Amino acid sequence: MIIGYFLNTKDYYNLFIWKKRVLLLKIISQNTTNYGIQVPSDTILRINLAWCSSVKQLKDILEDHKNNSIFLDLPIKRIKPPNNKYTLDDLIPIISSSNQIKYFAISNVESPDDLEDYIEKIPTNIVLVPKIESPTAILNISEIVNVIPTDKKILMLDHDDLFAKILKNGEPVDNFKIYIQKLVDYCDSNKVILLRTIGVMFSDEEKRISD
């Protein structure tokens, strides 16, 4: 299986050669740039639109990182703050005109129907990345992957939200590992890239990209 990692730390190059697995994606969070950490040109910059307060601000970020490929992450049905205040339709002109944007993640995907609008509107050269955040999504994983229109298939796992959904559903805590293993096995068998978060950056001062 090919696994990509989201990294929030500066010292990450030594993490990419692990056993016999070759990692194709090096993705770093936009929030690291608020602390003067430089994003290497061969690294993909992930822009979580929950932390981007306007379309203009997104344009500014793209302008500041012309040499990087971009991974946009659009929160859908997000309850916890912060949250974006614009729609997919607001983003389409930017997405369609930018050669930097290579990936577009959609949160809370639980069925193929959740991707329908994005498949219709997002340019076909951009890889759609369903975010897997619930047991329902994992149970429907084959159907979800089958509708991704690009040859490259990528999924993004949110461990915290998956665990929260398991607790909310009243399921045994042990199911957490079972669901993750089911997802990993599926990706392994079907040559699907699975993005998982490793590394956290801590600071005594919060600097949000929307400040």
What are these regions (language model features)?
Residues I2-D211:
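Expand to "…catalyze enediolate/carbanion chemistry for C-C bond making/breaking, isomerization
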